């Protein structure tokens, strides 16, 4: 078995799917670790082509020989909630001004999509996490 490469850095970024380019914030974040920026951009864009329009978080592991691997996560819960509720952004004062509504089915669908990244044992616990995020954004969850 080949010896394990030594990890020199872990970079977490949220990038629009299929739209990675060497401009900030991607270029500087990768450049300071010595990663080939264009190589990452091409690989990321190819991997996220089918999810255009979503923000996809990525965790890039950089090794000492300047090679890298990356893991794609599911889109942030807030982004999925905004899309489902049809609002551009959450409320500035969430507990007084409500900006949208979500049904229990929509919350459950988002929870199923996010399940792999959430710290929840079952779909009901995941739904509660998503409902809490929605409430803190000023979006009402119908019972």
UniProtKB/Swiss-Prot annotation:
rRNA-binding in keyword set: yes
Keywords of this entry: Methylation, Ribonucleoprotein, Ribosomal protein, RNA-binding, rRNA-binding
GO cellular component, one term: cytosolic large ribosomal subunit
GO MF annotation terms: large ribosomal subunit rRNA binding; structural constituent of ribosome
CDD domains for the chain: Ribosomal_L11 (cd00349)
SUPFAM superfamilies: Ribosomal L11/L12e N-terminal domain (SSF54747), Ribosomal protein L11, C-terminal domain (SSF46906)
Any one of the GO BP annotations: translation
Pfam families according to UniProt: Ribosomal_L11, Ribosomal_L11_N
Post-translational modification: One or more lysine residues are methylated.
SMART domains: RL11
Phosphoprotein found in the keyword field: no
Top-level taxonomic group: Bacteria
Function of the protein: Forms part of the ribosomal stalk which helps the ribosome interact with GTP-bound translation factors.
NCBIfam families: L11_bact (TIGR01632)
Subunit composition and interactions: Part of the ribosomal stalk of the 50S ribosomal subunit. Interacts with L10 and the large rRNA to form the base of the stalk. L10 forms an elongated spine to which L12 dimers bind in a sequential fashion forming a multimeric L10(L12)X complex.
Family stated for the protein in its record: Belongs to the universal ribosomal protein uL11 family.
Protein name per Swiss-Prot or TrEMBL: Large ribosomal subunit protein uL11
Gene from which the chain derives: rplK
